[in-house]
Amino acid sequence: MHHVNKYFNQTMVIEALKMSFYKLNPKQLIKNPIMFVVEVGMVLTLILICFPDIFGTSYLSRGYLITIFIILLITILFANFSEAFAEGRGKAQADSLRQAQSNLTARLIEENGAYRIVNATELKAGQNIRVENGETIPADGVVINGLATVDESAITGESAPVIKESGGDFDGVIGGTLVTSDWLEIRVESEAGTSFLDKMIALVEGAERNKTPNEIALFTLLTTLTIIFLVVIVTLYPIASYLHLILPIAMLIALTVCLIPTTIGGLLSAIGIAGMDRVTQFNVLAKSGRAVEVCGDVDVMILDKTGTITYGNRIASEFLPVNQQMLEKLIVAAYMSSIYDDTPEGKSIVRLAKQMYINELPKDIDGTYKPFTAETRMSGIITNEISVFKGAPNSMINLVKQQQGNIPLNIESLCMDVSSKGGTPLIVIENNVMLGVIYLKDVIKDGLVERFTELRKMGIETVMCTGDNALTAATIAKEAGVDRFVAECKPEDKIKVIKDEQAKGHIVAMTGDGTNDAPALAQANIGLAMNSGTISAKEAANLIDLDSNPTKLIEVVKIGKQLLMTRGALTTFSLANDVAKYFAILPALMMSTIPEMTSLNIMHLSSPKSAIISALIFNALIIVALIPIAMKGVKVKGYSIDRIFINNMLIYGLGGLIVPFLGIKLIDMIVQFFV
């Protein structure tokens, strides 16, 4: 979805602030052990405010303790806000989607052709409805009659209306979208609770998102580091006593909060939620957060040619007769074989024939139409006088041979010429006589070459699977820029391709929409099923594209990469922060008792009290500063993995070491006048 910015509004910020206070509940906060430690420290500080000498005599004033308490509270609120804000984006999206389907009625077409107005929630799959200009489509469905423009901006964010008509790839409509011209008759495909909008709303408001294995592993590491720092602080107290250094409990609490990885601890949940939301904004349903995360590890992508690499609607561009005298006969025969063919290819053949034939072609032909099937790989019409068919070269040659017909000497070279150009050849026969070849042109989708180049730099190999012959496949693969191809590939062959790649240790992603794709979708590490596909395909996949656009697999994989890189970059920054804060604060605390520590106080912090307050303020502010990065993710450019690693180490590793020194010093220059 492309209308993300409108969710960054005042209402959402206010709701996130409210949720920040609600999440102060220890039952909520204990899910994040790092921030729970901060809350425990905050409670202990509150006790010290009420009873300053409960843990022994302290030289810290009540005002100083209140300052520490407030900063700790703000730190927790900032961390809660980042998570609530990420959740709020999804909820705002759900509210927007819910408005699109509220209070809708439908014009139901009765069996006698009459219309009856009903509530949209009463519609059943299989019923037919009529929607006219200015009306909202009440349910998901397929156009069976009419042609109109439809505004889908409420769903996709795209302002330009799209044309919907029966047949082809543009016959699916989504409930909640607006008809902006003419009228449509639609066969309902979904019932109340199962529509596109319902699925989107269920995703963003559904069950609690479980942590992914990588997230759990990182949480375990961060929790371990927190425990280690707690042990360090606990042992620091007796060491300080031995050195006759007075370290009040409140100062030790503040030091603990500064040293444990609060930055990434406060942002980790938000990073995962924001990653899921970014996938949702592309109208992709992820069955789990793990599916999105695995996308980041994908290094092999299995892509269908038709619909993914090419537009899917192959267009008739030329008639190639076996000899020039046969051209008119070829045009008429191609037209006759396609007049009842509702596929985009068939319609394009009819259009081309009308353009090229100077005489008028018949509008209706009395005969029996034979549709294309996967078994016959041909289609055509049989009348009392003639039979005309078009189809795949192998099928047509075999048919002519079975009926003892003649195979023109140049028919194979004509087919080879078409294949060498990346097109698909269809042979046309009339009464078992080969007339020539129809050149169906495959059109490569715009921008794919650049995207495949970017994926290659990121270490992802692309493999094109196609039913075309090797020559056609090689031409398309070269033009599109994919790394490898598998020609004459049947759906069941994809499983072998996937298993072979997995046996080499690769993480494989693929797309599919049919029942025959289901085993391969289940076998792949990431399976992206089309919403227009079969139920079995959608059940086998772990991602569902509600727009039924196979090319989205590329975007989803990039989002997965971005999620992992964002988590890694901010973890690096957080840990580098902790190291920097350790060397910034400890010398300032110890220099009064251990003069040798003065040389390590490179920032010349004013006093232990100002050093602690400055570090606490910086600790809270850095969480807020990093929220936009957690929400949007770090930029994933078309660099190699090594280049990205080096960039992140320079920006977030080295930056994580330098920024605390500068930040704490600047804050200390102000704080020293108040403590």
From Swiss-Prot:
Task: Share what the entry says about its subunit structure, partners included.
Answer: The system is composed of three essential subunits: KdpA, KdpB and KdpC.
Protein name (Swiss-Prot/TrEMBL): Potassium-transporting ATPase ATP-binding subunit 2
From the UniProt record, report the name of the gene that encodes this protein: kdpB2
Q: What function is annotated for this protein?
A: Part of the high-affinity ATP-driven potassium transport (or Kdp) system, which catalyzes the hydrolysis of ATP coupled with the electrogenic transport of potassium into the cytoplasm. This subunit is responsible for energy coupling to the transport system and for the release of the potassium ions to the cytoplasm.
The record's annotation in InterPro entries points to: ATPase_P-typ_cyto_dom_N, ATPase_P-typ_P_site, ATPase_P-typ_TM_dom_sf, ATPase_P-typ_transduc_dom_A_sf, HAD-like_sf, HAD_sf, P-type_ATPase_bsu_IA, P_typ_ATPase
Q: Which cellular component terms (GO) are annotated to the entry?
A: plasma membrane
* Chain residues that bind ATP: D341, E345, F372, T373, A374, E375, T376, R377, M378, S379, K390
**Catalyzed reaction equations:** K(+)(out) + ATP + H2O = K(+)(in) + ADP + phosphate + H(+)
Q: What is the lineage of its organism?
A: Bacteria, Bacillati, Bacillota, Bacilli, Bacillales
| Location in the cell | Cell membrane
Assigned EC number: 7.2.2.6
Instruction: State where it is primarily located.
Output: membrane
Which superkingdom does the taxonomy of this entry point to? Bacteria
Q: How does it sit in the membrane?
A: Multi-pass membrane protein
Where Mg(2+) is bound, by residue?
D513, D517
Record: active site:
D304
GO MF assignments: ATP binding; ATP hydrolysis activity; magnesium ion binding; P-type potassium transmembrane transporter activity
Which family does the record assign? Answer: Belongs to the cation transport ATPase (P-type) (TC 3.A.3) family. Type IA subfamily.
Ordered alphabetically, the record's keywords are: ATP-binding, Cell membrane, Ion transport, Magnesium, Membrane, Metal-binding, Nucleotide-binding, Phosphoprotein, Potassium, Potassium transport, Translocase, Transmembrane, Transmembrane helix, Transport
Chain segments annotated as transmembrane: 34-54, 65-85, 216-236, 245-265, 569-591, 611-631, 644-664
